[in-house]
Amino acid sequence: MNFNYHFIWSLVILSQISQVQAGFGDPREALAEIQQKHGKPCDCAGGYVSSPPINSLTTVSCSTHTAYSVTNSLKWQCVSTPTTPSNTHIGSCPGECNTISYDSVHASCYNHYQQCNIGNKTYLTATITGDRTPAIGDGNVPTVLGTSHNLITAGCPNGKKGQVVCWNSRPSVHISDGGGPQDKARDIIVNKKFEELHRSLFPELSYHPLALPEARGKEKIDAHTLDLLATVHSLLNASQPSLAEDCWLCLQSGDPVPLALPYNDTLCSNFACLSNHSCPLTPPFLVQPFNFTDSNCLYAHYQNNSFDIDVGLASFTNCSSYYNVSTASKPSNSLCAPNSSVFVCGNNKAYTYLPTNWTGSCVLATLLPDIDIIPGSEPVPIPAIDHFLGKAKRAIQLIPLFVGLGITTAVSTGAAGLGVSITQYTKLSHQLISDVQAISSTIQDLQDQVDSLAEVVLQNRRGLDLLTAEQGGICLALQEKCCFYANKSGIVRDKIKNLQDDLERRRRQLIDNPFWTSFHGFLPYVMPLLGPLLCLLLVLSFGPIIFNKLMTFIKHQIESIQAKPIQVHYHRLEQEDSGGSYLTLT
């Protein structure tokens, strides 16, 4: 009998056991979640701070600001680069600068700077407000003066906080000032030299007056941008079909800043794939290095002449090994990046070609467009009557493209997994390299349309959020992004047009309604106040009645309690032999 009871209870207990998985799950999925939460460097998910964080893992230059990956939160915090007052040149330098001047000062050491002169030489001057120790590279980092002088990032002058100092306006070779005026001057110098090189290799064409290329209208989208979006959607459809069949692809307005991912070293062992044959020559452009840890770097020594092109040092990664182009067994050290890749050098600048006289250190990278994804299930703020009523907008959840394509998982598996994934994105990276300038102008045209239509909206006092091209409809403007709708068949070019038609139909219904257009058009402005006014009116009207009813009920309950008589209960006590009868009161 006991055996039967034990058997029955064992079955009951086993039926209540549920399957669980021990451990912390797939670390690659965790990495993808972390990177989606913290975002891309230039998105500044950690916000803007006045001074650089004390402890950071890496630094990425974003033109107008510098992003720092903070160790305690891993979110990217940004610091705006110093600005120049309206009067940028103050004439002679302060007296303190006549005794000592510095080669370079980091941009985080001051808030504003100006130009001044000492003799016939131009310097930069500012009041030091911060403290920063110069960044020293590893012992094998190639520099101008050898491995014993391996300074790669400038610092603040020691003991000069609160004092005025001066430093050279011309950038120091291979030394970065953290995105300050010297780094900007270096970019200008390099861009000019590449423009001269481009003109010498590709002379400008003179068009016949009757054969000028047709100007692209502002209501049309550039074919390069459409091809890029189509390629992105094709890859997304191959990796996550459920997401690709109903989503929005959002491009950042303004100049594009693509993501730079580590290039698969197995495809270019010891940089044997580099060559000096003809390759597309594009101007240097800014990228966002992503997931760079230990990299194989290549460098060329400084020749100490005026013909050298200083591309800077790749300070965003730790170079585990170096390939010296200067001593390579080649007739020259000019290099072409392998197909679908670029050289990423100092200041996060990307190059498709490095001429013979280049100097600095670079890494190979594959590009990925800076595109965010909005799932179709995510409600986007298409204007409706609730926008006229002042309904608060909901934040849009954006998914970075590298998360949607599963690139973070591939990167975390190492070189082999990355190689398999990056090979699939070769076409996309090559297309992005070729069309980065055209895409920039296209999105800028769209941004101009957004700004122009925004002025019209404000002038007409219409609370429209759908800011698109006036003819045909191009994209949906969301959070300074230009979003294109896509389904399983590809990019839907008439999606915005349909939304516009629906919006116009609803707007006409409101306009034709005499209730909405009464009071000389002031009703749309009064409607957001009607809710609070109605609530206040209800409180003032029914509040006293409810209060009186409540007080009456409480008073009645108190009176009923007081009116109850005190009931006295008697019972006979137990009698003992020697006692008599007693009564007790309870």
UniProtKB/Swiss-Prot annotation:
* Protein name per Swiss-Prot or TrEMBL: Envelope glycoprotein
Could you describe the subunit structure of this protein?
A: The mature envelope protein (Env) consists of a trimer of SU-TM heterodimers attached by a labile interchain disulfide bond.
Motif (CX6CC) positions are 475-483
What are the BP-aspect GO terms? fusion of virus membrane with host plasma membrane; symbiont entry into host cell; virion attachment to host cell
Positions occupied by motif YXXL motif: 570-573
Superkingdom, natural source: Viruses
According to the record, the signal peptide region is 1-22
Give me the ranges of the annotated region Fusion peptide: 398-418
Q: Which UniProt keywords apply?
A: Cleavage on pair of basic residues, Coiled coil, Disulfide bond, Fusion of virus membrane with host cell membrane, Fusion of virus membrane with host membrane, Glycoprotein, Host cell membrane, Host membrane, Host-virus interaction, Membrane, Signal, Transmembrane, Transmembrane helix, Viral attachment to host cell, Viral envelope protein, Viral penetration into host cytoplasm, Virion, Virus entry into host cell
Cystine bridges: which residues? 247-250, 247-483, 475-482
Show the segment(s) annotated as Immunosuppression.
458-474
Q: Which GO terms describe its cellular component?
A: host cell plasma membrane; membrane; viral envelope; virion membrane
InterPro entries tied to this protein: TLV/ENV_coat_polyprotein (IPR018154)
- Residues forming coiled coils: 419-469, 479-515
| Transmembrane spans | 527-547
Keyword set includes Transit peptide: no
The residue spans the entry assigns to the Extracellular side of the membrane are as follows 23-526
Q: How is it modified after translation?
A: Specific enzymatic cleavages in vivo yield mature proteins. Envelope glycoproteins are synthesized as an inactive precursor that is N-glycosylated and processed likely by host cell furin or by a furin-like protease in the Golgi to yield the mature SU and TM proteins. The cleavage site between SU and TM requires the minimal sequence [KR]-X-[KR]-R. The R-peptide is released from the C-terminus of the cytoplasmic tail of the TM protein upon particle formation as a result of proteolytic cleavage by the viral protease. Cleavage of this peptide is required for TM to become fusogenic. The CXXC motif is highly conserved across a broad range of retroviral envelope proteins. It is thought to participate in the formation of a labile disulfide bond possibly with the CX6CC motif present in the transmembrane protein. Isomerization of the intersubunit disulfide bond to an SU intrachain disulfide bond is thought to occur upon receptor recognition in order to allow membrane fusion.
- What does the record give as the function of this protein? The surface protein (SU) attaches the virus to the host cell by binding to its receptor. This interaction triggers the refolding of the transmembrane protein (TM) and is thought to activate its fusogenic potential by unmasking its fusion peptide. Fusion occurs at the host cell plasma membrane.
Q: What is known of its domains?
A: The YXXL motif is involved in determining the exact site of viral release at the surface of infected mononuclear cells and promotes endocytosis. The 17 amino acids long immunosuppressive region is present in many retroviral envelope proteins. Synthetic peptides derived from this relatively conserved sequence inhibit immune function in vitro and in vivo.
Question: Which positions does the motif CXXC occupy?
Answer: 247-250
The residue ranges for the Cytoplasmic side of the membrane come to: 548-586
Site positions for Cleavage = 394-395, 568-569
Q: Which SUPFAM superfamilies match?
A: Virus ectodomain (SSF58069)
Query: What Pfam families is this protein classified in?
Result: TLV_coat
Entry-listed glycosylation sites: 120, 237, 264, 276, 291, 304, 318, 324, 339, 357, 487
